[in-house]
């Protein structure tokens, strides 16, 4: 059932200065109390003296505020507007006009309807200025809340989120009422539904029903087309159309286990329990800065289809603070059945609650006690990249930058070929210039953050390989350059001749470097100064205990050893 409270304006000559005082009307199931206006079946205005009117007034007349109520909350109506603010109200409407007898009659009718019917929402329509009405309503709430008489107070029941057979019957009953009140035949309705602008023609009706059922208008329009068997919709299962629009984001059992593992790790690092973690999630004043690290880690581990907003919503619902008595509220068999259903369906709480005969909130409150913790291997497997995933990632980056970067340069990056460059940043795209959300969506198995990190790791590895290859290339060139000078091998006779030259010059010298090598080069021009010095050093170092022996003595011993060898060796 839908209750609507309309605040409308009797128009006089289409000018704002001549507008009369607002009047109200309320309606339920087609019955209405008329106050100068007609409340139609699909919540639209039928204005008396319907002539030309300003565009701004037209726009304001179509505004609608929908209020959702929690159980046992009391709300007061005055002049057709809420005075006591509901916990999840979107906006408030009000008027500065004094309360009239008509207003009081409407308020009384509203109170009786809510007391006697399982209503779940109230629609308030107003044509007054939005900003001024909200301001007036807030001031009225502050000043008048305690002064409103108890006769103008009532309790409203909370809306159920799950799509049940009762909701389906209710929706079909509203469709039948629409046909009856509007005197529309079934054939005429089919003609309306076949029109591509059917949503606009039935906008008021769909808005009213959608606000009660908590479903999208497009989904309900599909339901109507399937119900009336409009061409192209005959084979659609009308029983599943509204259910497909589950308001809860679905997490698999493995996803839930990974979340539990990360949350427990966070609690361990922060030194808090799950109850305190729930307070941090539910209260912005207790929100801890390290929560961002928790979100980032979960986004890296969970599928790309799950947004940050979805993760936050899951954490708030599953880990909200609980009364200690709720810990053992369920039997062990019920908890096992809950685990089995989540394993089969994921976290589709509405469907699971129907099968367990309880509420979605109760299922969510107990889920933390049975989800358990995932193994470390599960998280490690989600973090690791396979060769196929890495190759696909690089191909996606390569294809997205094909027009901006030379193919050969990109190929050398992604295949790790021998490709030297003095400035790698000029050769490959920077990490912050890549649309990682698009890359992640195409890859399908990793989050945008994980893709970015893996790409940066690849760049770092490539840069390191490039530097090593460049260093090795320089060494090869240097060795090749030395070989090009015609370097010859030292035979025993050559080494003996070298040491004899050194022996004549060493005298009291204590180091090979103190020898006049330029003079020796003149005597042995086939070798360079560096080559002769290196050969002499090696020959002296071959003498046992040469470090503790005078240079002249070491040279003498080396000469003696060389003379015992064949000269052509």
Swiss-Prot record:
Subcellular location: Nucleus
A GO BP annotation: termination of RNA polymerase I transcription
Hydrolase is among the record's keywords: no
Annotated Gene Ontology cellular component terms: nucleolus; nucleus
Domain Myb-like: 322-371, 377-459
Renumbered residue ranges of the record's region Disordered: 1-26, 133-159, 459-487
Primary site of residence: nucleus
Keywords, in A-Z order: DNA-binding, Nucleus, Phosphoprotein, Repeat
SMART domains: SANT
InterPro entries named among the record's database cross-references: DMTF1_DNA-bind_reg, Homeodomain-like_sf, SANT/Myb
GO MF annotation, one: sequence-specific DNA binding
Pfam families according to UniProt: Myb_DNA-binding
Domain of life: Eukaryota
Bias kind Polar residues: ranges: 9-26
Residues that bear Phosphoserine: 21
Basic residues bias spans: 474-487
Protein name: DNA-binding protein eta2
Native source species: Schizosaccharomyces pombe (strain 972 / ATCC 24843)
Organism placement in taxonomy: Eukaryota, Fungi, Dikarya, Ascomycota, Taphrinomycotina
């Amino acid at each position: 059932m839908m209750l609507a409270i309309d605040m409308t304006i009797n128009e006089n000559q289409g000018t704002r200065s001549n507008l009369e005082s607002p009047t109200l009307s309320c309606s339920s199931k087609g019955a209405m109390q008329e106050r100068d206006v007609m409340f139609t079946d699909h919540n639209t205005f039928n204005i008396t003296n319907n002539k030309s009117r300003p565009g701004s007034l037209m726009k304001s007349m179509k505004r609608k505020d929908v209020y959702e109520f929690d159980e046992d909350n009391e709300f007061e109506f005055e002049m057709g507007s809420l005075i006591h603010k509901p916990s999840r109200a979107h906006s408030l409407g009000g008027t500065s006009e004094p309360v009239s007898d008509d207003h009081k009659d409407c308020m009384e009718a509203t109170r009786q309807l809510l007391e006697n019917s399982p209503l779940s929402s109230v629609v308030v329509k107003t044509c007054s200025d939005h900003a001024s009405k909200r301001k007036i309503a807030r001031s009225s709430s502050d000043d008048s809340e305690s002064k409103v008489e108890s006769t103008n107070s009532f309790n409203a029941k909370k809306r159920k989120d799950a799509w049940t057979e009762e909701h389906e019957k209710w929706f079909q009953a509203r469709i039948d009422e629409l046909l009856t009140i509007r005197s529309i035949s079934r054939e005429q309705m089919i003609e309306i539904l076949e029109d591509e602008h059917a949503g606009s023609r039935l906008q008021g009706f769909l808005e009213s029903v959608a606000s009660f059922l908590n479903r999208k208008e497009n989904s309900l329009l599909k339901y109507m087309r399937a119900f009336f068997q409009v061409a192209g919709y005959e084979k659609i299962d009308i029983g599943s159309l509204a259910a497909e629009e589950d308001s809860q984001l679905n997490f698999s059992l493995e996803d839930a286990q990974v979340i539990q593992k990360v949350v427990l790790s966070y609690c361990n690092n922060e030194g808090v329990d799950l109850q305190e973690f729930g307070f941090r999630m539910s209260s912005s004043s207790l929100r801890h800065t390290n929560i961002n690290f928790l979100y980032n880690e979960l986004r890296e581990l969970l599928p790309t289809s799950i947004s940050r907003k979805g993760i936050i919503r899951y954490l708030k619902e599953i880990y909200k603070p609980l009364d200690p008595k709720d810990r053992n509220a369920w039997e062990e068999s019920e908890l096992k059945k809950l685990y089995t259903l989540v394993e089969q369906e994921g976290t589709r709480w509405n469907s699971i609650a129907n099968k367990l005969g309880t509420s979605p909130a109760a299922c969510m409150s107990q889920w933390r006690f049975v989800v358990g913790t995932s193994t470390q291997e599960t998280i490690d497997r989600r973090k690791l990249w396979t060769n196929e995933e890495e190759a696909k990632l690089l191909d996606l980056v390569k294809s997205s930058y094909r027009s901006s970067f030379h193919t050969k340069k990109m190929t050398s990056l992604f295949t790790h070929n021998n490709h030297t460059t003095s400035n790698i940043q000029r050769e490959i795209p920077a990490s912050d210039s890549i649309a990682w959300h698009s890359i992640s969506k195409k890859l399908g198995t990793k989050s945008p953050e994980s893709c970015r990190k893996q790409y940066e790791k690849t760049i770092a590895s490539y840069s390191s390989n490039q530097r090593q290859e460049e260093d090795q290339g320089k060494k090869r060139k240097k060795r090749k350059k030395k070989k090009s000078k015609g370097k010859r091998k030292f035979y025993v006779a050559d080494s003996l001749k070298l040491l004899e030259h050194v022996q004549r010059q060493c005298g009291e010298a204590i180091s090979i470097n103190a020898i006049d090598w330029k003079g020796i080069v003149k005597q042995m021009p086939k070798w360079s100064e560096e080559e002769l010095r290196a050969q002499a050093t090696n020959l002296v170092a071959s003498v046992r205990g040469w470090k503790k022996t005078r240079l002249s003595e070491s040279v003498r011993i080396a000469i003696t050893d060389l003379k015992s060898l064949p000269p052509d060796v």
